[in-house]
UniProtKB/Swiss-Prot annotation:
<feature type="binding site">
    <location>
        <begin position="69"/>
        <end position="70"/>
    </location>
    <ligand>
        <name>substrate</name>
    </ligand>
</feature>
<keyword id="KW-0418">Kinase</keyword>
<keyword id="KW-0028">Amino-acid biosynthesis</keyword>
<feature type="site" description="Transition state stabilizer">
    <location>
        <position position="34"/>
    </location>
</feature>
<dbReference type="GO" id="GO:0006526">
    <property type="term" value="P:L-arginine biosynthetic process"/>
</dbReference>
<dbReference type="GO" id="GO:0005524">
    <property type="term" value="F:ATP binding"/>
</dbReference>
<keyword id="KW-0547">Nucleotide-binding</keyword>
<dbReference type="GO" id="GO:0042450">
    <property type="term" value="P:arginine biosynthetic process via ornithine"/>
</dbReference>
<dbReference type="Pfam" id="PF00696">
    <property type="entry name" value="AA_kinase"/>
</dbReference>
<dbReference type="InterPro" id="IPR041727">
    <property type="entry name" value="NAGK-C"/>
</dbReference>
<dbReference type="InterPro" id="IPR004662">
    <property type="entry name" value="AcgluKinase_fam"/>
</dbReference>
<comment type="similarity">
    <text>Belongs to the acetylglutamate kinase family. ArgB subfamily.</text>
</comment>
<feature type="site" description="Transition state stabilizer">
    <location>
        <position position="252"/>
    </location>
</feature>
<keyword id="KW-0963">Cytoplasm</keyword>
<feature type="binding site">
    <location>
        <position position="192"/>
    </location>
    <ligand>
        <name>substrate</name>
    </ligand>
</feature>
<keyword id="KW-0055">Arginine biosynthesis</keyword>
<dbReference type="InterPro" id="IPR001048">
    <property type="entry name" value="Asp/Glu/Uridylate_kinase"/>
</dbReference>
Amino acid sequence: MLNNMSNNTNNITSVLTESLPYIKKFQGKTIVIKYGGNAMVDEALKSSFARDIVLMKLVGMNPIVVHGGGPQIGKTLKKIGKQSQFIDGMRVTDSETMDVVEMVLGGLVNKEIVNLIHQHGGHSIGLTGKDGSLISAKKLKHDIEPTSEIIDLGHVGEVDKIDISVINLLLKGDFIPVIAPIGVGKDGFSYNINADLVASAIAQALNAEKLILLTNASGLLDANGELLTRLDDNIIDGLIKDGTIHSGMLPKINCALSAVKNGVKSTHIIDGRVAHAVLLEVFTNSGVGTLITCNE
């Protein structure tokens, strides 16, 4: 028993010692975290994520959370008897579905995250991209390969412009912003936007130190299924050309590349199924995912 206690103490001491240089390095820096996947549905992972965010704030960082909520939207639609339809992984969003999206993302999911942060001693404010004109959106025009036929996805949008005024106001007040990826267009309509795209755009607008994307994978894997721990844009271009990066991971990689090519120091694609994944990635030498930087 004494040996076990000694080993545990040594492990804790090692982690704390290892984290100190990173705490100093990133004090006062802005880190945008896209929160999604298993980390949003597993109770233990939800709690560990909230604690990670609170600790980052306590040691002087400025974490900003952008969240998804696809499974929760699907569950609510099913309850009201409405079928979910997807094209190339994107939810077809008519006006009725958009009402549900706003209710679930802007209400249920957003406020649950805010409440979890509060439970662990943090101070956060939840908002959507419609608040303070944070996210100006435009309708997404999606074409299907190989015909290039333009498909109307309804209220599915992309980021047109980010106004960081409301975020800066919250950071100045020492709050943790928790943002639902809903924007408003010049036409006055609400649009549901992919949370990875929103997180990347906000990170770029703020010149953030880091963009962290939580996934249901270990990170970016090579052709043999081995984790690629560190990549730059040149290597990634090659991996896309040879087909190593494909399908569902490709849009996420494009978000990561867009960020590091436009002022964000680094992007991290990490395994949200690992407890305290955010802290392990930011505060340890080995991390728990793939670090992406720009070679320019």
